[in-house]
Amino acid sequence: MSLSGLGDTGKAEPPPALFPAPDSDAPAPARRRGGQPQNGPPRNGSVQGDDAGRQLVFFGAEAAEPAVADLAGLLAGPGEVVRMGGTARLSVQVDAAWRVHVLVAELAARGLAASWEPTEGERHAVRTSYTRVLKPLAAAWLHGSAKRPPATFHLTGRRLRLWLAAAGTPEPPDACLLRLGADDQECWEPTGVALAAAGLAGTLLGPADGGPAYRITGRRRLARLAELVGDPPRAAPPEAWPT
């Protein structure tokens, strides 16, 4: 199976208009196993105010430089982290080629080499190398082998941007679905609390209702989400990002 814009040979193929090839001036490239570097730049937009218009957004996507701590946004969703000795590796499965482009570039912007490969069900696995850089993140989120947010967990614009890029789906006209890890029940409730604290209170959908996921509804909440995550990445289809 060929990933749009990332050919099976490892060489870039002319991508469909829906999945534009990443810019050549993107951050450090990542490689598909046995392939050539692939890039995909994140593009952040401006953030202005909260959903009630009463205070500034202090945690929008442009409020700080990219940091490894932002990857907590992937772990709030379906991302996984595993430890090996004094190192750790983060991985996430996604359902579209544009998500691969965006996540590889976001990881590179944080100094993390990444690879990708196709998986079952026309999905794609994006993963970092094992690195000591991710050890603190793994220590905070892993309790034995179970993933659970630390007590201090909160959602910023950059964390939400990564979660949206990995597993977010707008549902016009006034909803957005943020998917969770199917086996991460211990994460679901505290993640909902963090969403509410960010002004994005959502409804938890169980597996029987098309989840697990949080559905964010209402124009004001969607405007808040759009403010926090910034402009869509270049590789994202217009309908795949809240505006």
Segments predicted by a language model, with ranges:
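Internal intein/HINT superfamily modules and their associated LAGLIDADG
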Residues: 1-243
